[in-house]
Amino acid sequence: MAPRAGQPGLQGLLLVAAALSQPAAPCPFQCYCFGGPKLLLRCASGAELRQPPRDVPPDARNLTIVGANLTVLRAAAFAGGDGDGDQAAGVRLPLLSALRLTHNHIEVVEDGAFDGLPSLAALDLSHNPLRALGGGAFRGLPALRSLQLNHALVRGGPALLAALDAALAPLAELRLLGLAGNALSRLPPAALRLARLEQLDVRLNALAGLDPDELRALERDGGLPGPRLLLADNPLRCGCAARPLLAWLRNATERVPDSRRLRCAAPRALLDRPLLDLDGARLRCADSGADARGEEAEAAGPELEASYVFFGLVLALIGLIFLMVLYLNRRGIQRWMRNLREACRDQMEGYHYRYEQDADPRRAPAPAAPAGSRATSPGSGL
C-alpha cells in the first residue's frame, strides 16, 4: 500500500520534469531574448529591420525594439498586419504588457497601429521624429497606464499636436504621460482632461508659464488629488502673468517635485532667479510696446533690495574708517592747521605793511617841475 500512496507525488514530479524538458519557443530572428522569450525580447538590428518581427512568441510579456528603421507603423503592426495595412484577424500578443520602440526613426503612426495588444500597459515611443499621428493611433489599448513621447513631437508642428489631443482622448486609464523635450508652448488640453492621470512630464519644453485655465484644469472635482507636474527646464517668464502660477505652486508644492528648479528666463533683471523666491506682489507687467529696456525695468525682488542695503553698509564702513583715520591723526592735523594759520597770518601782515607804506603821504614822490620854469630860475642870469 505504501508504494501506491507515493504514486501521486511521483507522477507530479514526472509532469513537472516533462514540462521543463519541453523546448521553449525560439527567439525571433534579429532579436535577443533574456530569461526566455516570454520575459524580455530586445531587437536592435539597425536599418535592415523595417517592420516589427513577425515571429514574436505569443506569450511574450516585454518587447523592446531599438535602433531599427520602422519609419511607419501601420494598422495592427503588432497583430500580424501586413505591409499594405491589412489587419490580421485575432490577437497575436495577448500577454504583451510593455512595448519600447525608442530610436527607431518612426515618422508615422497610423490609426490602430497597436490593435491586438489588449494587455499593453506601458508604451514608449520616445526619441522618434514623429510627423504624423493618427487620431485613433492608441485605440484598442484599454489597459495602457504609461505613455512616453519624450523628444518625439518636435518636428510635427501644430497639426501633430492637434492629432495628439485626439489620440489621447480614449486613454481613460492612463496614469503616466511623458511629453518632455517637445518644444511645447502650452499643455495639451486632452492631457488635462485625463481623469486618472497621476503624473505629467513636460520638462525641457518652451512653456513660458501656465495660464489660469490650465491651472484650473489641473484640479479635480470632489477634492481628488490632481496629477503631479514635472515642469523644470522651461523658459518661464516672470512677469505679472506668472502670479497665478506662483500662487498655485506655493499651495501645491508637493504636486510639483521639481518646483525648486523652476527659474526665470525673462525679464533680464530676473534671469536665472528661482521662481519660488520671488514676491508675487512685485512682479510687474511690461508695457505692450516696451523693448528690452522695458523688460529690465520689471520686478525688482528682495535680492535687489538686499544689494542696496549692502551698498549702504559698505559706504557706512568707509565713513567709519575715515573718521578713525582722522581721530588717530588728530595731533598732526592740529599741527598742520596751526602752521597753516601762522602762514596765513604772516602773509596778511606782509600785505598790511605794504598797504601802509603805499598810503603814507610823506613817501609820495615830488611832482615834476614844469618845462618852462627852467628859463626863469634864479641861476639862469636873466
Swiss-Prot record:
Residues 358-382 are annotated as: Disordered. This is Trophoblast glycoprotein-like. The chain crosses the membrane at residues 308-328. InterPro entries: Cys-rich_flank_reg_C, Leu-rich_rpt, Leu-rich_rpt_typical-subtyp, LRR_dom_sf, Wnt_signaling_inhibitor. The gene is TPBGL. Residues 329-382 are cytoplasmic. It holds the Pfam family LRR_8. Residues 365-382 have a biased composition (Low complexity). Keywords: Disulfide bond, Glycoprotein, Leucine-rich repeat, Membrane, Repeat, Signal, Transmembrane, Transmembrane helix. It comes from the Eukaryota. Disulfide bonds join C27-C33, C31-C43, C238-C264, C240-C285. The keyword Amino-acid biosynthesis does not apply. The keyword Chaperone does not apply. It is a single-pass type I membrane protein. It comes from Homo sapiens. One of its GO terms (biological process) is negative regulation of canonical Wnt signaling pathway. Residues 27-307 are extracellular. LRR repeats lie at residues 57-80, 93-116, 117-140, 171-194, 196-217. One of its GO terms (cellular component) is plasma membrane. Residues 1-26 form the signal peptide. It is found in: Membrane. Glycans are attached at N62.
